[in-house]
Regions:
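GNAT-family acyltransferases
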Residues: 9-94, 99-102, 115-119, 123, ...
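Short, small-residue-biased leader/transition segments that mark boundaries at the very start
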Residues: 1-8
């Protein structure tokens, strides 16, 4: 858990999503600062810094910019995080996610992405959720497919793009 479980305890959170094994909490600025302080992966420092800055710059829409902590229901341990990459453009927010290595390949990402997409579809104007993965990240592509995403046939900056359309 790398000591991140206490991030949610200090959150004073205003919303959370609960799944069978997880709860998801969008991190407020103090939670983002705690996450940044404990981040050991140098590739995550800049994205987390950007998320904090953007959530502060858009206080009325901060949930679309911040990281959402993923915690185990039973232990409260930090499993990973996900994010929407800003306000939905054309009703299509983009989702990103990552888990600590010890929690990979156990269905946590599928569970979290499914819950986050369900939440997004409950927000005004959201008609689809998009994602893109590294071309070699077949595990992430499998997560997206299990949730119901389909390939768009286009490439983004990170790799192939996927879309999940809201059921009408």
């Amino acid at each position: 858990s790398r000591g991140l479980g206490d991030v949610y305890k200090r959150q004073g959170f205003i919303m959370q999503l609960i799944t069978e094994r997880l709860f998801l909490i969008p991190l407020q600025p103090d939670g983002m600062r705690a996450l940044l302080a404990r981040t050991t992966d140098p590739e995550l420092v800049q994205p987390y810094t950007d998320m904090l800055d953007l959530s502060l710059a858009h206080p009325d829409q901060w949930v679309w910019y911040t990281a959402w902590g993923l915690y185990q229901n039973d232990s409260g341990d930090w499993v990973g995080d996900l994010c929407f990459k800003g306000l939905p453009e054309n009703g299509h927010p983009e989702i990103g996610y990552g888990l600590l290595p010890e929690y990979e390949h156990q269905g946590y990402a599928t569970e979290a992405v499914r819950a986050a997409c369900r939440w997004a579809f409950g927000q005004p104007g959201v008609t689809a959720v998009e994602a893109e993965t590294d071309p070699g990240n077949t595990a992430s592509q499998a997560v997206l497919r299990r949730v119901g995403f389909v390939p768009t046939g286009t490439m983004g900056e990170e790799g192939p793009r996927f879309i999940l359309r809201k059921k009408t």
